[in-house]
Amino acid sequence: MKKYFMIVVAAILATFLFMAFSRIKQQESLSGSYVVLGWNDLGMHCANKTFAKMCILPPYNNQFSHVIKVGDANTLPVVQSAGSGFYVTYEIPGNTYSVGKTDFWTYASQLFGTTISPNIGLTGMGMTGTMLDSLNYFYAYGIPITPYTDVNLTTESPFQLAMLKAYDAGNTLLATTQNTIPVSNEINCVSSGCHTSEQDILDEHDQLPAFNNPPVFCATCHADPALGMPGNGTTVSFSQAIHQTHGSLTNNCYKCHPGPNTQCLRGYMKIIGKTCTDCHGSVSNVGNTIESGRIPWVNEPQCSSCHDANHSENPGKLYKLSKGHSGLFCEACHNSTHAEVTSENANDNLQNLTLQGYAGPLKKCEVCHGYIPAGPGPHGYNPVGIIPISGNIPTSSEILPNYPNPFAFMTNIPYMIKDEGPVKLDVFDLSGNKITTLIDARLKAGEYKAELYANKLSAGTYICRLSTNGLNYHRKILVVK
């Protein structure tokens, strides 16, 4: 079995190496000049809870980060690269150990042919450590986290927060952030109601001698690209076997993918009503397309299936491996697959909410640039509050009715500027307390709109005030919850 362990580790590293409070103080630029962005690659990592009979997936989680030196009006931001002397550490506050929360280490030597130290994962990473660096990002593969915190060993907490800390070569703490490190054991074939026991699954393979000597590692025979396991070459991949066998029995993805309690599909696609099958097709379709030549985990649905080229992956790459603005990973600003911000889960939104004051993709230019640059940014996006509507020059300055109104999530606030000059757009409550400033910049004459998110607003009536060239204009807006 030792050769299987070596295959797993080598293949996992080869596959991923070049791929790209307790709420503790979340995102903090301690020196005032650095930002660290963290993310997980998949939106959910699954693992068996018990390994006495078989192993579908071991404890294995990933974290990534960028460290950015904030720019100013005269200097562009700098994404710190490998060899710069900077480094990033990771930890999971409230979850400091895994031994005892799972029996993985009891059976690891039988499954992988070698002894693995307690609380250390397949790649040698522990529950805390220093991330490795590659090009312009930092990474940690194989963190052996379980969904159980130190104070609750029986109830899953699938959306815990990792703490990332960025340091310079002199060991000065520069910035911190917290981002989701998702994990679930809710892939159990028994708890799903499909099988009476794990032994029942092994009995389906009773013609194979190895199944009389558990635990059995499924990927030993069934290829699993997620683990870098090639299989034995004589049977179908694990994904094909599972989806084709069960496709005629259910079209409920949460029978296996976590799960009715975890609800791992939680991102913006979920919010706007998309389901698993909208992108992946039916359970049977997932298996049948593999039989037709698709490689699971490698050939997956593309953003470009619905979005234009300006909002799509890099050619030939998955979303999780694609990069955009200044070489940043797409997930650094938009978050993980299946958990795109704005997410239904508060922890997914925490990093961007802390950085820019509202949930959603990271698009407040000042976070990295230190000021609002002129002209459009990534995806042709203009800074919040400075979104041109048309090239028309208005005959008067005015704040127009917002839409939708009332609103619960986000509203657009159109406004017109007659003459070039300083512009402020503020939001007040009915007591006259300023809630937020949407724009404070010098604008040319034109028609614009601002976006206001309701995540920090209680239900009620608010006043938007547009100030330009010594005059004020007001408009009521209504928030519902």
Q: PLM features: residue spans?
A:
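Inter-heme linker and motif-flanking segments adjacent to c-type heme-binding CXXCH motifs
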Residues: 170-177, 196-211, 224-384
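Surface-exposed, short loops/turns at beta-strand junctions within beta-sandwich domains
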Residues: 153-158, 455-458
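Short, aromatic- and glycine-rich surface loops/edge beta-strands on solvent-exposed regions
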Residues: 65, 157-169, 462-466
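Glycine-centered coil/turn sites that cap beta-strands in beta-rich domains
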Residues: 385-427, 437, 449-454, 468
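Extended, solvent-exposed segments with strong compositional bias
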Residues: 105-147
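Sec-dependent, cleavable N-terminal signal peptides
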Residues: 1-28
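Short, surface-exposed loop/turn motifs with a glycine/proline- and acidic-biased composition
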Residues: 420, 438-474, 478
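Short S/T/G/P-enriched beta-strand
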Residues: 24-62, 68-87, 91-95, 172-212, ...
